[in-house]
Amino acid sequence: LQAYDLEGSIDDRRRPLVRIETPGFTDPLVAFVDTGFNGALLIDERQAARLRFSVARDSIKPVQLASQRNEDFRLGQGSFIWLGERRTIVAYVLIETPDERRARTARKTEEEILIGTELLWDCRLEIDFPARKVLISKVVERVTGPPHDHIGNQRSL
């Protein structure tokens, strides 16, 4: 492995994940890899605060989930260390009632986040389901960047 490789696994629910050491958290964050999510991160409000992300209360972004359910998220901006590189990114932040938050956190045993294709844009992602292994490797050759920004707007190349 090289310094910019991240190894992970497949959990019992067949979800690819990696563990990320992150300032502000005692234990590594469990980051589920979601190639159907074209943003960088999906986090909750508490995680956004611990990551010191700036979340604008009026920055509501409607999103249609893979389940076809519509949900609103806030947008938060901050600095995140990804594969040894500090990046300024925009995260989707869950909007939850206190009851929803309690129910979700009761189901978790660890801090969980979702990483999407915006973070994976300059990476090679290998998922080996039979071996239950995940490998994310940073590609050394520079790529110009994703053809869309973090909220799905077309970029000119």
Language model feature labels by segment:
Residues 1-157:
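Pepsin/retropepsin-fold aspartyl endopeptidases
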